[in-house]
């Protein structure tokens, strides 16, 4: 880690978004408030703390802000892998606003958000072309990505192990029709994985998400050209794998991009901030706007454009059922979010709560 002044050239090699000092006024204000601090990126997140870096080769364990240690401090306002922070020695003194992120509703009865990765350009949604293949799960991931500012790319792995690759691609034709990129690869074959190069250029950051056993760690190793990430075999009867990746980590690639590998996630709850139109259901939302009734449930109402499309074989009924389920989940989470925001605003009035660091937007 540098102890004098920022080297923006080396910072660019781990995803710094500008050729020199920050151009975002919000970032500039935070830099001005901490004139002795230096920028670094969070490259690992553990239960006990963080690892940060200012070059691809140099990293150190960082001491987090004291308020992050409080049990009731919102988890999405703590640093996540991919975040940019300001450091004084080994101490994190400020968290810079996020340009993009992917979040989920944290498990449990109470409303919480969890940031999966921050300041990312691309989210690779990884799903195996075996018993792991689940279009409904892919749609759920697309919903979480939508609105966060990053581009989703669906990556179907294990294309060498199944005869059903073409059938799987046919199932996802509706997504491709919405300009959602889709690639089928053999995660062990460098030539096959080269299909992902357009999203892994110099200075870009991508994150891998998907269930355990989908091939994320294998894909990471192939992109690295070395066996850095541990991989496990999956069970043949259901294609389920053990959690190979145990923590989130940002890894520089030979291409000049950065890749964030994540553990498999069993639960994918919306945060309430999602937009179904941006989350893979723009066609269904467009049809819903044509229904006779504004509150159409798309079940048996007269003049329902969605039901008409299903009957004309223009929409997959299972996909529409998932859309309806997710719509209810998003609405429920949005109510909880509104309650939490109202509580936070009252707390801010008394000086008890900090502002959010999330400012989603395209890089």
UniProtKB/Swiss-Prot annotation:
Output a single Gene Ontology CC term carried by this record: cytoplasm
Q: How is the cofactor bound?
A: Binds 1 zinc ion per subunit.
Which keywords describe this protein according to UniProt? Cytoplasm, GTP-binding, Hydrolase, Metal-binding, Nucleotide-binding, Ribosome biogenesis, RNA-binding, rRNA-binding, Zinc
Q: Residues that bind GTP, according to the entry?
A: 157-160, 210-218
Sorted alphabetically, which CDD domains does this protein's record hold?
YjeQ_EngC
Q: Where does Zn(2+) bind?
A: 291, 296, 298, 304
Instruction: Give the region (Disordered) as residue ranges.
Output: 340-363
What EC designation does it have?
A: 3.6.1.-
Superkingdom of source:
Bacteria
Coarse class of the protein's main subcellular location: cytoplasm
Assembly, in brief, is: Monomer. Associates with 30S ribosomal subunit, binds 16S rRNA.
State the family named in the UniProt similarity comment for this chain: Belongs to the TRAFAC class YlqF/YawG GTPase family. RsgA subfamily.
Name of the protein: Small ribosomal subunit biogenesis GTPase RsgA
State the organism named in the record: Xanthomonas campestris pv. campestris (strain ATCC 33913 / DSM 3586 / NCPPB 528 / LMG 568 / P 25)
